[in-house]
Regions:
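Short C-terminal domain-edge/linker segments immediately following a structured domain
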Residues: 137-140, 151-156, 185-188, 239, ...
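Conserved kinase catalytic-core segment
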Residues: 173-235
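A general structural signal for short secondary-structure junctions and capping/turn motifs
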Residues: 4-9, 97, 112-113, 144-146, ...
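Conserved ATP-binding subdomain of kinase catalytic cores across diverse folds
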Residues: 32-37, 49-165
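Regulatory N- and C-terminal appendages and interdomain linkers associated
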Residues: 1-80, 299-349
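Short charge-dense sequence patches
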Residues: 12-27, 54, 75-89, 135-141, ...
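AlphaC helix of the protein kinase catalytic domain
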Residues: 166-172
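C-terminal catalytic region of ATP-dependent kinase domains
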Residues: 215-349
Length: 349
């Protein structure tokens, strides 16, 4: 069982980095302000199951002020701060999550002209999560939008079907071809998480995204929680295949894919990551330098992880690492140096 991760503050070097890449909110917003709600009711899904979210309410004066701030935040996320769109927006709901580490607020903003709506989240800013978000933006197939204001983090909503919901309600109805494609995507997702040391990817921490092509439906798997970036010491935590919640996906891989295909898909991930690391070399170097001098885990976790990685790779750079940022640098150096070798990490599939 994973221990609750503490929240690590964002240091000045990381703030300077975020400023350089337009990640600082121009609109003041504080997570603690949203905690001053005067009441709440439980939110249930369409099957009348408790979602562990509550819908919160504020006094009339506070609500009008909060709504205006949230609409300005929306304009920053989606239209580069164009305040002209605010007159077409309405904050339909503010929900608070009672489950998990970050206890986020989920904001629903609706366009009153056509009833289209979108969500974003307000959380306490945490250095681990910010590093995870930034690495996701640079290295993953999908870009991600987020902003920071002092000790508050604003994250866009990542659309998709929660992995646990998909596994429970939709996986069995997929065609055999679709199951093979999902197995392939899980292998790739597993490899990406392992290489970039994104931990705790249980089925409820990622989404599955169906994409309708002209003659088929294909599926993508995307992380939605970046709290466990480079924190845990156990290397298995960074490999989704070892969580019991993901067993149906692991079984799918074993049932549908041959070993040679698994190795091929893992190699494809390494090749793509190596190219992305090279193409964003300056930005990644700058981020990893800051990460290398930051504290985002415990000494116990650091020592455990670097020795486990050394035993897997025989790369002395892991053993010499003085911080989790150094471990991340060693991992990226290792992958760019050796990505053509199909036996880099033995993931156990």
């Amino acid at each position: 069982m994973l221990l609750k991760k503490p929240s690590y503050p964002i240091n000045n070097s990381l703030l300077d980095y975020l400023e350089r890449f337009d990640r600082i909110s121009k609109v003041p917003i504080f997570y603690d302000d949203l905690l001053r709600f005067s009441g709440s009711i439980n939110v249930y899904d369409k099957h009348d199951q408790d979602t562990l979210w509550v819908r919160v309410y504020y006094t009339e004066f506070e609500r009008s002020e909060i709504d205006l701030t949230l609409m300005k935040i929306y304009s920053l996320l989606h239209s580069d701060g164009n305040l002209g769109i605010i007159k077409f927006l309405n904050v339909d709901s503010i929900d608070y999550c009672t489950f998990g580490n970050s206890k986020p607020f989920r904001i629903k903003v609706r366009n009153i002209l056509n009833d289209n709506y979108t969500h974003f989240y307000i959380k306490r800013a945490d250095a681990s999560r910010v590093y995870g978000l930034e690495l996701e933006h640079i290295l993953s197939p999908d870009k991600i939008n987020f902003l920071v204001y002092k000790d508050t983090l604003i994250e866009e909503h990542i659309m998709g079907i929660a992995g646990d919901v998909f596994i429970k309600t939709l996986l069995a109805d997929c065609t055999e071809t679709e199951k093979s494609q999902i197995a392939k995507e899980f292998v790739k997702f597993n490899e990406r998480c392992m290489i970039r040391l994104l931990g705790d990817m249980r089925s409820y921490n990622y989404v599955i995204i169906p994409i309708h092509d002209f003659d088929q439906v294909v599926y993508r798997i995307r992380a939605i929680d970046f709290d466990q970036q480079c924190f845990e010491g156990n290397f298995k935590v960074y490999r989704p295949q070892f969580f019991k919640e993901n067993y149906p996906m692991v079984k799918l891989v074993k049932d549908k894919l041959q070993h040679s295909s698994i190795e091929q898909y893992k190699d494809e991930v390494r090749a793509v990551l190596a190219k992305r690391i090279h193409s964003a070399e300056n930005r990644i170097k700058r981020l990893l330098q800051i990460m290398g001098s930051d504290v985002i885990s415990t000494d116990e976790h650091l020592n455990q992880l670097k020795l486990e990685l050394y035993s897997y790779t025989n790369d002395l750079n892991f053993k010499k690492a003085k911080s989790m940022g150094n471990v991340m640098s060693a991992a990226f150096e290792f992958i760019t140096r050796n990505f053509k070798n199909t036996n880099l990490f033995n993931t156990g599939f």
